[in-house]
């Protein structure tokens, strides 16, 4: 098996740091997180040898040139993965929502193996919950108690860890993807997607109903979101663009389109785009309505008025911190309330824009705190071992601080 990175780097003499998470191209949000974690580590330790433990090594090699080495950890022998641990100076767990039923124990098994080999471990703005399975709860309680530092991305996750019985300090910061830098999404790319120049655009993110619409069958759920899309088409004289954040979202986007009375006014992005390009695309939008957390984050980063449709605690928590309106859930009989909230979002945004921009600055600064805590731990590790590479100057992961775009002007 070829374990060489796609982008060979000169030998590095800094610390050897491994990053473990749900990486490998399955979800744009997770890929955005990995981009930001690697950028942080490279900014703090330019000479570090960065290893990514990936669920799809080929994808990670191709899309993350900051990684010096990529090692698969699914579908390979346990010994193959354990061979990565000797010589590590730090194992970074996360970020992202990886501590939940059925998955937590899989990640923490490797963290525990690192701990038994005296490798320092750091939880990088992870998300937790739901955690009801006894084996997962025990793994979270025991393994996180022995980590060198535990940082979660929201208050909901801290409360989940507290309920599980974790008795230690847990820092709350914000999602690492808040520090993502945009990449251009050009007019030529817009044409390739069949999106007309100069049109008002509404971005939508849909996924399986989950707890956001637990009383709806799938057909009613799709019909409700189609009502929202049709309303925005009429209200704003706009086109609707669906942004799949992972591949299963495409099916739900097609289903919503099929329920619309004006399906010709809807498009689904079909290209294979990097997280930075998706963030760049958001700058073309006039308003955004969606369920996926990182869709909501990207919209907020670009100053687009956004209505989160929460399906889990992480979206509720982000909407609360952003000060954005957020519905408890969606039900067919509440369609009128949902449409009224969308209408109010559009009308009131000019008055709310400055407050949202201030809150986003605070959230970006909070996300930066995770990077600083990781850098401090690397300082301690280097001091204890008498090396570890020189720290970089104090700067954001991309070298120029968090991205804060001016919003696209609202059309009259």
Label the model's feature ranges.
Residues 1-412:
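Active-site anion-handling motifs in enzyme catalytic cores
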